[in-house]
C-alpha cells in the first residue's frame, strides 16, 4: 500500500475524520469496475460455475486483526493483533510509533507485545490491504484477468517470485496520532508484491485509489500455485474495506 508526504498524512486524517462522521459514502465511487452488490454479499469463498474457481468476499475494514485464509481447505479464521505483552517476549514482536515525514520514518517509541496468533494451517493473511503469506512467494503478472492466463502455472516457472519481508512501518494499527503525523504500526512480515494490489495517491486532493488490476500468483509451501485477482476494495453501496478477490486454486 503506497503512502507519501507530510501533507499526505493531513489529507488522510481529514478523510478518516470524514469517514467517521459520514462514512465517506460515494467518495470513491466509480474507481473499481465491478463493485459487489450488498444484497449479494456472502462472506467467504463463493464457488463459481468453474471448478476450482471462487469469488472470495472479505470484510477487511478492521485494522486490529489478521484474516487468515487456507486455500487448501477453503477455511477462514481471524485473529486479533496483540496490543500488550502477557507472557515471555519472542524478541521481535512490537508495536512501533513513528513520526512520518514523507518517506522518512522517525521512531518515537515501541512496546513489546505478544506473538501474533496464527491458525495451524493457512496460506495467506490479510490486514486491511496488507498481505502476508505462510512461507510462500508472489509474482505480479502482466494479466488483468484470470481467464486470460496461460493454461498452466508452469509458464511462469522461470519468473522471480518474491517472499515476504519483515516490516516495521507497513501495518497500521492505530491512527489516533494522525494529526501529529504519529502512527502506530505492528512489526510484521508482509508480502510487498501482493500488498501493492491497491495504491493510494495523495499528491492532489481528494485522495485517489488505484488498483493494479493485475493477476498475482501465490506459490505456497507445498509448491502448489493459486491465481489471485484483486478486483475491488468496496461494495456497490460504497462500504470501504469489503474486498472482492477472484481466486483460482489450484492453478
Regions found by a protein language model. Name each.
Residues 25-251:
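Surface-exposed, beta-sheet-biased, low-hydrophobicity segments with strongly acidic/polar composition
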Residues 2-12:
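Bacterial N-terminal signal peptides that target proteins for export
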Residues 20-23:
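C-terminal motif of bacterial Sec signal peptides marking the signal peptidase cleavage site
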